[in-house]
Design a protein with these regions (language model features):
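Nucleotide/phosphate-binding catalytic cleft detector across ATP-hydrolyzing
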Residues: 1-173, 181-299, 305-350
Length: 350
């Protein structure tokens, strides 16, 4: 009963903040990627959260995919940066310009009325960090802004009916943060947010290649290794790929073969921390909801959940069936866009 009251009160408060708001756009403002969802059209834009600018003039040269291709390949005066770090804004000015660019690209410049935008944030952010996201979105051209916690958005996007009085567990692994939450009656009952996610997988691979093979590789190469042979759990067949980088001893280009077994070793520390965080949330979950989760399983969302073997690792360590959402990359964006419809439906039911 106590849980019911807490979550209904929370939903009433959210409702007041965006009274009768039928949002036009949902934005998944991720550390690695930005996705834009428009009602009736679905996800219309997915681009890397990267901006390239000239250090001498401070002018922006490229945004999104074009800027990502410049990472590690720019002349000295042009810098490619990620204005969001671990789920929060690290460079306000650049984030605002990036948001404005993506919103205009998604809706076109012909729209006469400013859009209403819902944006998601990690569950562990402070009120100050939430305010920064809200302000940046308003400055980028929003008429009204609604802020939504990522696990709630992920659950809606994964097709879970969050309004029901039963426990659902979501593990949303993005680029900068992993958000883990138990959701019931439209609210978060227990949650945690850790700053270990997809970017940390890439960094762990860079460190491993340097230490094990004396090979210096860039961010894009590390991501490529993660996608092609990355593993969190032993594969039935070992996968291999050739990786080019710079030999740290000779300074010359060098090619080495990397196996999925090696990536499992490289990623062990990061994946173990995610498993520990899942354990921690399960330990704090009320017994009735824990029973629901044991029946319904754990749902993974976010780009980081695509790491091969992550489902098996979590399932083997918790004993609870673990599955990845149908389209984990877009679940948060879809849920962010649909959240307001959910609130409107909730008020109609009252």
């Amino acid at each position: 009963k106590k849980i019911r009251k807490t979550n209904i009160d929370r939903m009433k408060n959210i409702g007041k903040g965006i009274h009768m708001l039928s949002t036009d756009i949902g934005v998944d403002l991720g550390t690695a990627s930005i996705l834009v969802y428009i009602k009736g059209k679905g996800v219309v834009l997915k681009e890397p959260s990267v901006v390239a600018f000239d250090r001498d003039t401070n002018k922006i040269k490229a945004i999104g995919e074009e800027a990502r291709l410049m990472l590690g390949r720019t002349p000295g005066n042009i810098v490619a940066v990620r204005p969001l770090r671990q789920g929060v804004i690290s460079d306000y000015r650049v984030t605002e310009k990036m948001l404005k660019y993506f919103i205009q690209k998604a809706i076109g410049k012909r729209m006469l009325k400013k859009p209403r935008i819902s944006v998601c944030v990690p569950s562990g952010v402070t009120e100050v960090e939430k305010k920064a996201v809200e302000d940046a979105t308003l400055q980028a051209g929003a008429r009204e802004v609604a802020i939504i916690e990522e696990p709630i958005a992920a659950a809606i996007g994964a097709g879970i009916d969050i309004s029901r009085p039963c426990g659902n567990m979501i593990v949303d692994i993005g680029g900068g943060t992993t958000d883990i939450a138990v959701i019931s009656l439209g609210g978060t009952v227990v949650s945690t947010s850790i700053k270990i996610a997809g970017d940390d997988f890439d960094e762990a691979i860079v460190r491993y290649m340097r230490k094990k093979h004396n090979l210096l590789i860039g961010e894009r190469t590390a991501e490529d290794i993660k996608i092609k042979v990355g593993s969190a759990y032993p594969r039935t067949e070992i996968a291999t790929m050739n990786v080019r980088g710079r030999n740290l001893v000779t300074g010359l280009p060098k090619t080495v073969e990397v196996t999925s077994e090696e990536t499992q070793e490289a990623l062990k520390e990061a994946t173990s921390q995610i498993v520990e965080a899942v354990h921690s949330v399960l330990e704090k979950t009320p017994p009735e909801l824990a029973s629901d989760i044991a029946d319904r399983g754990i749902v993974l969302t976010g780009g980081g959940s695509l790491l091969q073997g992550l489902e098996e690792l979590i399932e083997s360590k918790t004993g609870i069936h673990t599955m990845t959402a149908e389209d984990p990359m877009t679940a948060v964006a879809i849920g962010t866009g649909k959240f307001i419809e959910f609130l409107a439906g909730y008020r109609d039911d009252k």
